[in-house]
């Protein structure tokens, strides 16, 4: 930032996520880090107003990467899921979802490649007046629209309705 201030211009691009403006069950740490990144990005944007430095948030959504495989490895390493009260949910839904999600109909229909995100980043670096936010995939654009028109209560109902583990009865 000091170099950008000195030269009078620059671009800071943060790679955020759809989970930086909505939350999904059982993804608390990831949700929290992306919400924090969005807050930090907004703060920087305000603090750097008038300096010639643009602060941009790129929100990819479903992109074909190794995130699911890596998430599964870290989940098994750091979460004592077999002793958790959520064991059934993890076993029946979350672990299989992380294993199989890349082959799901949803992802085949909506998932983009990393090059598509790179093109958006390249564009945001070179366009005269970049947007504050680039929502990359159709699901990200759709959910951004839903966040803007639904109450928090109705948004949560929508997210819960489309979250398989929440449809499973809890053990008492």
For every predicted segment, state its role.
Residues 6-8, 25-26, 50-53:
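Short coil/turn segments at alpha/beta junctions that flank glycine-rich nucleotide-binding fingerprints
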Residues 33-36:
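Active-site helix of classical SDR
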Residues 1-6, 45-46:
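Amphipathic alpha-helical dimer-interface segment in Rossmann-like NAD(P)H-dependent oxidoreductases
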Residues 23-31, 43:
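Active-site loop-to-helix junction immediately N-terminal to the catalytic Tyr of the SDR YXXXK motif
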Residues 133-144:
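Short-chain dehydrogenase/reductase
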Residues 50-131:
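SDR active-site lid
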Residues 17:
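Residue(s) in the substrate-gating loop at a strand-loop-helix junction
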Residues 14:
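Rossmann-fold scaffold of SDR-type NAD(P)-dependent oxidoreductases
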């Amino acid at each position: 930032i000091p170099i950008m201030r000195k030269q009078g211009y620059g671009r800071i691009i943060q790679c955020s996520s759809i989970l930086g403006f909505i939350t999904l069950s059982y993804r608390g740490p990831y949700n929290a880090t992306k919400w924090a990144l969005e807050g930090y990005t907004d703060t920087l944007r305000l603090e750097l107003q008038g300096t010639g430095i643009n602060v941009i948030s790129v929100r990819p959504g479903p992109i074909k990467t190794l995130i699911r495989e890596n998430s599964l490895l870290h989940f098994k390493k750091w979460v004592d899921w077999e002793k958790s009260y959520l064991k059934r949910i993890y076993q029946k839904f979350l672990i299989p979802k992380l294993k199989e999600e890349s082959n799901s109909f949803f992802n085949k229909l909506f998932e983009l490649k990393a090059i598509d995100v790179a093109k958006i980043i390249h564009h945001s670096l070179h366009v005269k007046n970049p947007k504050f936010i680039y929502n990359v995939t159709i699901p990200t654009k759709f959910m951004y629209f839903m966040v803007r028109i639904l109450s928090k209560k109705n948004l949560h109902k929508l997210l819960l309705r489309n979250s398989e583990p929440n449809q499973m009865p809890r053990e008492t």
